[in-house]
Amino acid sequence: MPREIRLNAFEMNCVGHQSPGLWAHPRDRSSQYKDLEYWTDLARLLERGRFDGLFIADVLGIYDVLDGNGDAAISQAAQVPVNDPLALITPMAAVTRHLGFGLTASLSFEHPYPFARRLSTLDHLTKGRIGWNVVTSYLESGARNLGQQAQLDHDRRYDYADEYLQVLYKLFEGSWEDGAVLRDRRRRIFSDPGKIHEIRHVGEHFQVPGIHLCEPSPQRTPVLYQAGASSRGKRFAAEHAECVFVAAPSKTVLKQAVADIRQRVAEAGRDPRKVLVFNLQTVVLGETDAKARAKFDEYRAFVSYEGALALISGWTGIDFGQYRPDQVLRHIHTNAIQSAVEEFSSADPTRTWTCLVYTS
């Protein structure tokens, strides 16, 4: 049986997602992100184009590592302003039948008990088309604005995430038995208390004694995405994820990443072929190669170098403003997204990376 290619669109509820500066293009529509029709039109387009899903990114905080402030991110609309992604799902589901939705939501700042209810509600309303991109927040600005002095250390964030998932699994899978909902009009009994159980979770980070507030949804546990590519992040993905998102900058890096993920999945006792790996690709289309190249060059003319530096500085925790554009990158261990540094500076030794480009 031939293997299928799965296609997810990649969006964010903001003006500038991963192409900072393109909002200034005269044909750009991203400033309409505040309008419901923008999102329902996109959902219809993706369904008509046979896409499998729409993956919606998110951050809670601003990119303020570059020059020690958020001015570049704000002036260049580098993922700010940014609206909540969750509210987009239901209206897009209402105008489609098959399109899946991957919701990015950080577990760093929300207790699993109310979050479980949100996910189950979305699973009901989408009729089983919701997925969750499990992320641990990495922006220090987000932690500070929620009363924390700093983020947890990188690997500790995944320890916290492991327990978070255990609470959710207990709520989704163990609280309500199959057949707990009776809807018995004659006896006037809606649910059987004997088939609904308290989870009685007591752990290092959470104590959740009660039952899940939602009756079982179509999937119970939504499809789990994971985008961490550090060693600890890949171990977490191997234990939990059904879909792994990577952003490999070369075929060499991608081959290494996929092989490593599948090996770790097998070591975790799971079937590695049942874990889908999605790689980030930016595709520019044209009727001919020449027209596609011309369109690409046109788009590049709007690139904001300052906005791009704000993003990569936030992703890595390194102020790239201190480097020359032609300065070679070296591997640096940071507490932000470790994989962002590893991919550029150590994963592919055949390439030399600078702040602007790579050289073979």
Enumerate the language-model features and the residues they cover.
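Hydrophobic faces of well-ordered beta-strands that scaffold small-molecule active sites
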Residues: 5-9, 54-56, 101-105, 130-134, ...
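Short, conserved secondary-structure transition motifs
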Residues: 277-291
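Internal, glycine-rich beta/alpha segment that forms the wall or movable "lid"
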Residues: 3-4, 111-240, 267-268, 273, ...
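The substrate-binding groove and active-site-proximal loops of carbohydrate-active enzymes
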Residues: 26-33, 74-79, 102-110, 151-155, ...
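Catalytic cores of nucleotide-enabled group-transfer and carboxylate-activating enzymes in metabolic
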Residues: 62, 81-84, 91-104, 226, ...
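Active-site mouth loops of central-metabolism enzymes
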Residues: 23-36, 105-113, 220-231, 284-286
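N-terminal beta1-alpha1-beta2 module of alpha/beta enzyme domains
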Residues: 1-95, 219-222, 344
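Conserved small/polar residues in nucleotide/adenosyl-binding loops
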Residues: 358-359
